[in-house]
């Protein structure tokens, strides 16, 4: 995480001196679940199992715990070396994927509906969706999935989704990352350009919105400490890039608690550094946390209608 943070300009006056750590910001993570990893203990504020209906938190795959660690791990098990983006943010975990990392769209929709139900009570601000499925022609389930994800955005939540690992062909961004409304994250770096989903979408929407390093990102191991001596393990994919942006959004919402999701999205666009590749691969460019946190002037020129896994490990 240290190398990743350097690349995205994480270290700045806000994160180092002003104690901007995501404190008080609740982030819903729709994934394979979560465990009581030492880096997350005490900050898991909600739980729902839409797969098996269990009341006690668990993760039988590891993907969800890894994603949560990138977003909000405090690095306790590694003396801060592997701390996440927003180390004092809180996690509202919703299990929507099974032991194999797959699942049913209806379980994901049920998870979304639960987040909407608990949004005000739990003060949820951000929803991280590091999952996706390729579009299928005239598939009503795809349309329903997209409809409910956009309901999250319309409810005022910052929704961050993965571009998927089905690239690099054009039009390979997965659902729900192909939504005009959500913030869609692709993977940067040489390996990332070989698998990260590329736009434009079938509706000629410019996607992804931005790109972030997603290769061999070290984060929380769901088997630690009971079944493994290793507190952290690496994973690769747009799934890992997505919580980096969710964590950055948590920092911004701590600093500017009244900011709406649309304003945050536009500020994110305008703070990006131009990427090395064309727009269909990196959108508005690469995440620049320091500029994202500056947010000094209200952005009026939004250009929202610009046209032109996730799915798990690669």
Predicted regions and their residues:
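C-terminal subdomain of the subtilisin-like protease fold in secreted/lumenal serine endopeptidases
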Residues: 5, 124-128, 254-314
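N-terminal domain-start motif of subtilase-like serine proteases
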Residues: 1-28, 51-59, 191-199, 288-290
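Subtilisin-like serine protease catalytic core
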Residues: 16-28, 34-46, 55-106, 122-125, ...
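Substrate-binding/access-modulating region of protease and related hydrolase catalytic domains
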Residues: 96-179, 202-205, 225-236, 240-242, ...
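Hydrolase catalytic cores
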Residues: 68-71, 92-98, 214-282
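Solvent-exposed loop/turn segments at secondary-structure junctions
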Residues: 33-35, 50-51, 77, 97-101, ...
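Catalytic-core environment of secreted peptidases
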Residues: 36, 45, 188-239
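Structural detector of well-ordered beta-strand residues that form the stable sheet scaffold
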Residues: 92, 158-160, 184, 211, ...
């Amino acid at each position: 995480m240290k190398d990743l943070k350097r690349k995205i300009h994480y270290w700045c006056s806000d994160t180092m001196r002003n104690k901007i750590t995501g404190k008080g910001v609740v982030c819903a993570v729709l994934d394979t679940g979560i465990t009581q990893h030492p880096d997350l203990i005490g900050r898991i504020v909600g739980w729902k199992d839409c797969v098996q209906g269990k009341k006690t938190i668990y993760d039988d795959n590891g993907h969800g715990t890894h994603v949560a660690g990138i977003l909000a791990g405090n690095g306790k098990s590694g003396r801060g070396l592997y701390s996440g983006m927003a180390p004092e943010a809180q996690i509202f975990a919703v299990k929507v994927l099974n032991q194999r990392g797959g699942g049913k769209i209806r379980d994901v929709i049920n998870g979304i509906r639960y987040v909407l139900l608990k949004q005000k009570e739990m003060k949820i601000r951000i929803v991280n969706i590091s999952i996706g499925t390729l579009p299928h022609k005239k598939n009503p389930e795809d349309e329903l999935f997209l409809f409910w994800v956009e309901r999250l955005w319309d409810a005022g939540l910052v929704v961050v989704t993965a571009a998927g690992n089905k690239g690099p062909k054009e039009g390979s961004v997965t659902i729900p990352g192909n939504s005009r409304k959500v913030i869609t994250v692709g993977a940067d770096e040489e390996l990332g350009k070989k698998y990260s989903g590329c736009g434009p979408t079938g509706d000629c929407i410019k996607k992804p919105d931005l790109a972030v390093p997603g290769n061999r990102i070290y984060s929380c191991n769901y088997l630690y400490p009971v079944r493994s001596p290793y507190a952290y393990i690496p994973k690769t994919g747009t799934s890992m890039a997505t919580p980096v942006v969710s964590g950055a959004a948590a920092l911004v919402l701590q600093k500017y608690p009244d900011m709406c999701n649309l304003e945050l999205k536009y500020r994110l666009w305008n703070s990006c550094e131009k990427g090395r590749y064309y727009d269909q691969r990196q959108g508005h460019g690469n995440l620049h946390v320091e500029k994202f946190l500056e947010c000094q002037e209200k952005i009026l020129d939004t250009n929202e209608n610009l046209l032109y896994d996730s799915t798990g490990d690669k």
